[in-house]
Every structure is written in C-alpha cells, then in structure tokens.
Amino acid sequence: MYHWIGTYDGPIRPLVEQAYSLVPGASREGYCTVHDFSVGTQYAPIFQQIIPGHWVRSFLSIIWHNGTIPPHIDTDMREDAIRSHVVLDTNAECWYLHDGQWQQLQTGGVYRMDPLKIHASVNWGHGARIHLVVDTN
C-alpha cells in the first residue's frame, strides 16, 4: 500500500510543465520514465523538506491516456533505500496496485511504498499521470 507522508502545498502546474519539458520526443502512448540527471537537480531543492535524506535516484514516471505499467517488482532497488512518490498530476481514472491492494493517490500528495512488492498502475483517464519518484537513504 502507498502510505501518505505529506502534501506539497506549492504551485503544481509549473512542476508539471517542467516534467513535460524533460520528456523526449516520445509517441506519448503507454508509459515512459525520464531518468535525466536534471530531474534530481531541478526537483530536490523543492521537495527536500518533504523527502529528507540523500537522493540516491530520482526520475519521472509518466503514464499517458489509456496507458499501464504492468505488475512488476523493482529488482534494482537498493536495500537501504526508501522510495517516495510525489503526485504531480493525476486524474480520477488512475489506479495504483501495491501488494494486492488498489488505491487512488491525490495530486500534491507524497507517498512511500515498497518497490520490492508487486506494484502496477493504470490510467484510464484523459490526461497524463505524472509522478516524481525519489529513492533516498
């Protein structure tokens, strides 16, 4: 289950626009991840209060309209790392599966989850679902 740890109360729209600017010229179908170095440098100063610790890895996870991230386990996760998700954009038709439980997350919410448990996401809505994903230790 994703566990709520806080809320980002600042302006979300500039962060969403920044996320779109980092997306390579993709077809905007299915899902994509952006592992650009600039993700951490651009977002860490904003979220350091909510997500403390050393940012080991950060990336954007985007699911386009009618896209899915199939059930999986992140086997490349460091044992000492903690994974947080910042929901930059979502809609009422986005659902998250974690360890057998489905739930919906809220825009601006910051959540922790265990990536070593089976998880997946679907976006049946019309807009994109964008998360900033941060691993800390």
Give residue spans per PLM region.
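A short glycine-rich, His/Asp/Glu-containing loop-to-beta-strand
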Residues: F47-T68
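A short hydrophobic beta-strand segment most commonly corresponding to one strand
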Residues: I82-V87, V110-R112, H126-N137
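Short beta-strand His + acidic residue motifs that chelate non-heme Fe in jelly-roll/DSBH
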Residues: P70-H72, C94-Y96, M113-D114, I118-H126, ...
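Short, conserved beta-strand element in jelly-roll/cupin
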Residues: I62-W64, M77-C94
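A short beta-loop-beta micro-motif enriched in histidine and acidic residues
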Residues: W55-V56, I69-R83
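Tight coil/turn sites that cap or link beta-strands
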Residues: H65-G67, T107-G108, L116
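A short beta-strand-loop-beta hairpin characteristic of the jelly-roll/cupin
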Residues: V87-T107
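Non-heme Fe(II)/2-oxoglutarate
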Residues: M1-G53
